[in-house]
């Protein structure tokens, strides 16, 4: 395994040699420079993993802060630890603002320097892995659909992304709260920094406290695992998405509320760390009810819910199902090796007639299950038919291909049987198009007024939402 290259920049030869010896013993590969010219030349030849940089460099064209500025412009992810024997608080603050990873004064504790360096390298490694991962994994930041409600929601996401306010995303399980958070990050000014997800569900109070704020005091001196940065530190300059925020216990809510007031973390060792984070939270619960029942702090709710987004359920955007199915089939073909196939129109109709309590996640699972359980054999199963999808989906959706009363209709006069068919057929189509009169009439080939009369004649209820959706649709397609 190759050694980690570290550049030491100090005008004092003794200091350079001492630090180099320490790092060599710890398995690093130290490089040394006495001034800005040497330092920048070494970096130009081959960038290093980290830099230990003195501020006051006698006989150098640039001082440490000047070198730091150049490094952060050319190598933004490269961690720089500032050291100085003549530093002031103001100098330290300026260095951190300019992008230094940390600042320590001479004479420094050898162990402290090594721990700090290892931590800096670990953080940078994670950042690089995160960036690499973005180009390799499935694009999870695409909101698929062109229905009126989806287009409106996309516009709301764009507005939220342009704001620096905290955002709370409300939505049912599987509806796309995490996707919304990713989209906000992707469209924001923080897009080149980390997007971190924290889910407190199934975590103990102690574990949540450890992940967000650090180890307990009694553990501080026992091991070095607590030296790793907390999630709040990892997310610095980026976006932190807290999923199901209502699952955070009240004692941690109090600490989180305190953090939101000044964005500082007091580590168990006493060190104060200030961070700059965009915080987005998600919840499938009614937070106001949680507040009323004493399970969620009212003040915390108001601080997190500065901007609010409501994710539309899949039931509300059934028109997007054909596009979503095509999207999932393509993704599964690309990343799971399942052959790309077409879902028949009647299969799509059956999917649109289902209520989808599990939302987008459930639809994706159904598409995957269907492709796996119906492999192509001798040219068969190229087209996905209704009988191939899970039976529970068909059982709970209005079946357009086999009427429930088909046997009873054999004993009915034609007029009565036709009325039974029309009632079931139009009920299914209204459900499929989310009670939108315009879209239903267009699909079944009837004038809107004629469809209205037919529904009334068949005693089929027309919810008011159908008319509202219709108006929105007409405006969107004017």
Curated annotation (Swiss-Prot):
Boundaries of every Sigma-54 factor interaction domain copy: 143-372
PANTHER family: TRANSCRIPTIONAL REGULATOR (NTRC FAMILY), TRANSCRIPTIONAL REGULATORY PROTEIN
Name of the protein this chain belongs to: Putative response regulator NtrX-like
Single GO BP term: regulation of DNA-templated transcription
InterPro entries for this protein: AAA+_ATPase (IPR003593), CheY-like_superfamily (IPR011006), Homeodomain-like_sf (IPR009057), HTH_Fis (IPR002197), P-loop_NTPase (IPR027417), Sig_transdc_resp-reg_receiver (IPR001789), Sigma_54_int (IPR002078), Sigma_54_int_dom_CS (IPR025944)
Residues of the Response regulatory domain: 5-121
Pfam family, one: Sigma54_activat
Annotated GO MF terms: ATP binding; ATP hydrolysis activity; sequence-specific DNA binding
Positions of ATP binding: 171-178, 235-244
Modified residues (4-aspartylphosphate): 54
Gene3D superfamilies noted in UniProt: 1.10.8.60, 3.40.50.2300, Homeodomain-like (1.10.10.60), P-loop containing nucleotide triphosphate hydrolases (3.40.50.300)
């Amino acid at each position: 395994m190759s050694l980690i290259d570290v550049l030491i920049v100090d005008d004092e030869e003794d200091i350079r040699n001492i630090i180099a010896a320490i790092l060599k013993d710890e398995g690093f590969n130290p490089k040394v420079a006495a001034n800005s010219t040497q330092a920048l030349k070494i970096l130009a030849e081959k960038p290093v993993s980290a830099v230990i940089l003195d501020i006051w460099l006698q006989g150098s064209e640039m001082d440490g802060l000047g070198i730091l500025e150049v490094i952060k412009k050319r190598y933004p992810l490269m961690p720089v630890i500032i050291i100085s024997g003549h530093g002031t608080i103001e100098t330290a603050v300026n260095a951190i603002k300019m992008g230094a990873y940390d600042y320590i004064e001479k004479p420094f504790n050898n162990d402290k320097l090594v721990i700090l360096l290892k931590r800096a390298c670990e953080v940078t490694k994670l950042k690089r892995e995160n960036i690499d991962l973005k180009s390799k994994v499935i694009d999870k930041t695409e909101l698929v659909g062109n229905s009126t409600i989806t287009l409106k929601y996309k516009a709301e996401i764009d507005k939220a992304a342009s704001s620096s306010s905290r955002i709370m995303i409300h939505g049912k399980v599987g509806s796309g709260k995490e996707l919304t958070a990713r989209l906000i990050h992707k469209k924001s000014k923080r897009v080149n920094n980390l997007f971190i997800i924290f889910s407190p569900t199934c975590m103990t109070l102690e574990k949540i406290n450890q992940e967000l704020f650090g180890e307990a005091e009694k553990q501080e001196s026992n091991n070095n695992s607590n030296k790793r940065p907390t999630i709040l530190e990892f997310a610095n300059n980026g976006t932190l998405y807290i999923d199901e925020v209502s699952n955070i216990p009240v004692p941690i809510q109090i600490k989180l509320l305190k953090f939101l007031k000044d964005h500082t973390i007091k580590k168990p060792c006493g060190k104060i760390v200030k961070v700059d984070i965009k915080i987005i939270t998600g919840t499938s619960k009614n937070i106001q009810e949680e507040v009323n029942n004493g399970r969620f702090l009212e003040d915390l709710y108001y601080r997190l819910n500065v901007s609010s987004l409501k994710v539309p359920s899949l039931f509300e955007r059934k028109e997007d199902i054909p596009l979503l199915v095509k999207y999932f089939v393509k993704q599964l073909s690309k990343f799971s090796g399942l052959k790309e196939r077409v879902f028949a129109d009647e299969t799509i109709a059956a999917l649109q007639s289902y209520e989808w309590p599990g939302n987008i996640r459930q639809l994706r699972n159904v598409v995957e299950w269907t492709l796996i359980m119906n492999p192509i054999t001798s040219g068969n199963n190229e087209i996905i038919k209704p009988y191939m999808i899970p039976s529970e989906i068909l059982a709970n959706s209005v079946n357009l291909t086999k009427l429930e009363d088909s046997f009873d209709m054999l004993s009915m006069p034609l007029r009565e049987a036709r009325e039974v068919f029309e009632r079931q057929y139009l009920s299914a189509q209204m459900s499929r198009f989310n009670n939108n009169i315009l879209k239903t009439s267009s699909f079944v080939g009837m004038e809107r007024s004629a469809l209205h009369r037919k529904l009334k004649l068949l005693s089929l209820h027309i919810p008011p939402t159908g008319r509202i959706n219709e108006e929105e649709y007409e405006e969107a397609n004017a």
